[in-house]
């Protein structure tokens, strides 16, 4: 804001994914109604011990400052807040070195509460095989399910809140239509972000992600960590000084790895999760 003449953008390439863009459109158009619940199971990040041993900096508090949340999940944490907004309260359960000989988290379950009373769960690990990538967002009018490259919408005949208050049968749920949602099929990824960045400079066109939005996903990651370290829920925005204090405690006792770094085959790592 101090330099409005400059362009500041984030490389959030997953926002260009046609499925996530369509979900964003449907949610923000009101098509699913008021948010009730969001669940993301993103556990198809499988990593072996060899992966973690391949660099002295990997999976250390001093080298990376975190594990699966900071290394594998930044784009998913950005996407979930881009789609439905930041929660107001977070409870995190980070298991450090649960499945690998590492000092940082490799298994996480986080619980979210949103300002309107909606709730969410975010589950991730680098130890599940074959793993799952399923994002489900439920509103009062419809549920969106993103899995296996498809977007399914289960559209209710009536807003659930209205149905609940007016239906005269105790066990009858509202009927719904299952729709496989069409997208434009475009998945521009990094080139699309760079093209938008250039277009913003040249013609003032919208960025894929304004740089000021970059803090949101990190705030969510830090909140999950801090809550887990403290053993109780935290509210957002978090106490940044307290977070840094707790992180520095872990950095101070971080283990120094020995041995040479090795190169690994990263083919298939950068997919369209």
Model-derived regions: residue spans:
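A general structural signal for well-ordered alpha-helical segments in protein cores
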Residues: 19-20, 76-77, 190, 194-195, ...
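Conserved loop-to-helix N-cap of the C-terminal "lid" that shapes the substrate pocket in Rossmann-like
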Residues: 69-73, 208-214
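C-terminal glycine/acidic-rich active-site capping loop/insertion
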Residues: 114, 140-212, 234, 243-273
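Glycine-rich phosphate/pyrophosphate-binding beta-alpha loops
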Residues: 74, 99, 123-131
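Short arginine-rich
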Residues: 220-230
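Active-site beta-strand termini and strand-to-loop segments that position acidic
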Residues: 105, 110-116, 137-139
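Predominantly a Rossmann-like dinucleotide-binding segment in NAD(P)-dependent oxidoreductases
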Residues: 4-9, 14-102, 231
């Amino acid at each position: 804001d101090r330099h409005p003449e400059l362009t500041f953008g984030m490389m959030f390439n997953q926002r260009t994914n046609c499925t996530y863009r369509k979900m964003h459109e449907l949610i923000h158009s009101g098509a699913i109604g008021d948010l009730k619940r969001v669940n993301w199971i993103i556990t198809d990040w499988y990593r072996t011990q060899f992966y973690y041993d391949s660099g002295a900096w990997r999976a250390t508090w001093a080298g990376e400052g975190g594990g699966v949340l900071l290394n594998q999940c930044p784009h998913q944490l950005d996407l979930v807040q881009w789609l439905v907004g930041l929660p107001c309260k977070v409870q995190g359960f980070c298991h450090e070195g649960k499945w690998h000989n590492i000092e940082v988290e490799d298994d996480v379950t986080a619980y979210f509460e949103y300002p309107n009373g909606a709730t969410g769960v975010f589950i991730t690990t680098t130890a599940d095989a074959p793993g799952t990538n399923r994002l489900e967002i439920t509103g009062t009018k419809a549920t969106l399910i993103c899995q296996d490259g498809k977007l399914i919408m289960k559209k209710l005949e009536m807003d659930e809140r209205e149905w609940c208050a007016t239906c005269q049968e105790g066990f009858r749920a509202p009927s719904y239509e299952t729709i496989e949602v069409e997208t434009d099929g475009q998945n521009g990824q990094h080139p699309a972000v760079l093209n938008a960045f250039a277009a913003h400079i040249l013609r003032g066109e919208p960025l894929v992600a304004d740089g000021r939005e970059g803090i949101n996903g990190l705030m969510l990651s830090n909140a999950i960590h801090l809550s887990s370290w403290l053993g109780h829920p935290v509210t957002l925005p978090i106490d940044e000084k307290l977070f840094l204090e707790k992180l520095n405690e872990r950095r101070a006792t971080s283990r120094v790895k020995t041995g040479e770094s090795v190169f690994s085959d990263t083919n298939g790592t950068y997919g369209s999760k």
